[in-house]
Regions:
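Extracytoplasmic small-molecule ligand-binding "clamshell" domains
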Residues: 25, 31-101, 286
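Extended ligand-binding regions for polar small-molecule ligands
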Residues: 62-65, 69-71, 133-137, 141, ...
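Acidic, polar ligand-binding/catalytic clefts
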Residues: 65, 69, 73, 77-142, ...
Length: 293
């Protein structure tokens, strides 16, 4: 009996330690640090890129700033942790970043195998192909024998192999790690084709001095639902990222903006009042301030 009691006490002690560790999660780390670290790309126009002053801007960065505003009360308190397709998950899971706001496809293997928790789709995309007009190609089904620039560690690798196999074509893969590397190889002629999400192709083409000479082919060969991710095992932080995302969607639906938010606190719409913390205790339930949204 004594041994059983000792075992129970030891188990309770272990549980208490684990509970303390779990409670000291990402939210506490971010608050203590005073900055939110967002895992982003190395640079994609329109999504995440540093301007001439080194200030990061873009679609993904805006969501990163929204998260910082909710958690720290200041959208400027962010740090961009740049990553390639191969390193993004390692940087998140190792703790180098707090949240992944990066053009990343939600997949079964990334959720279950890589242990990522996804928090909704903030951009629906699909894989496409870009070629120089002088190649004379009108369809992806005419790309047999082409050299193709493709980022490693992405869903585009398997999609590309499947598409060419299904259409009885062969290709030469030119492996690259960053969008900038793809741009350089494509522009130099090292590869005939660049394939990635269609949004990424459009963003990359917009940076070309001769953008009008490059065409994105009509075929979209995959479904790429993009969304933010956090590590498994921190439910509170997962809830925060999830509801920061949904708060931005709801705010857009209800017409709440940074310019009219103070006026909206006098709204007669109870949904707006709850979102802005005038009524209810949603912020408290998340471990944030009443006006977190």
């Amino acid at each position: 009996m004594r041994n059983k009691i000792t075992s129970v006490i030891a188990a309770l002690g272990t549980a208490a330690i684990m509970s303390t560790t779990a409670n000291a999660g990402t939210l506490d780390d971010v608050k203590k640090r005073g900055a939110l670290r967002c895992v982003v790309s190395t640079g994609i126009a329109g999504f995440a890129y540093p301007d001439k002053s080194g200030v990061w801007k873009g679609f993904d960065i805006d969501f990163c700033r929204a998260t910082a505003a909710a958690v720290l009360g200041d959208a400027k308190k962010i740090k961009a942790v740049t990553s390639t397709g191969k390193t993004r998950f390692t940087k998140l899971n190792s703790g180098e970043g707090d949240v992944l706001w990066r053009n990343t496809t939600i997949t079964f293997s990334r959720d279950v195998g890589v242990k990522l928790r996804f928090h909704g789709v903030n951009y629906y995309d699909g894989q496409g192909f870009m070629v120089n007009k002088k190649l004379g190609v009108k369809s992806a089904k005419e790309l047999g024998g082409a050299s193709v620039c493709i980022q490693t560690g992405t869903t585009t690798e398997l999609n590309l192999a499947d598409y060419f196999h299904a259409n009885g074509m062969k290709y030469e893969a030119v492996a690259i790690e960053t969008n900038d590397e793809a741009r350089q190889n494509y522009m130099s002629g090292r590869c005939d084709v660049y394939t990635t999400d269609a949004s990424g192709l459009a963003a990359t083409r917009s940076t070309f001095p001769d953008a009008q000479n490059h065409v994105i082919l009509p075929e979209i060969i995959s479904k790429e639902p993009l969304g933010p991710a956090t590590r498994h095992g921190d439910d509170q932080w997962s809830d925060i990222v999830t509801w920061v995302y949904y708060a931005t969607v709801t705010a857009e639906e209800l017409g709440v903006t940074s310019a009219n938010v103070d006026k909206m606190k006098s709204s007669k719409n109870p949904e707006i009042l709850r979102m802005l913390g005038v009524e209810g205790n949603q912020g408290e339930e998340l471990g944030l301030s009443k006006d977190w949204a």
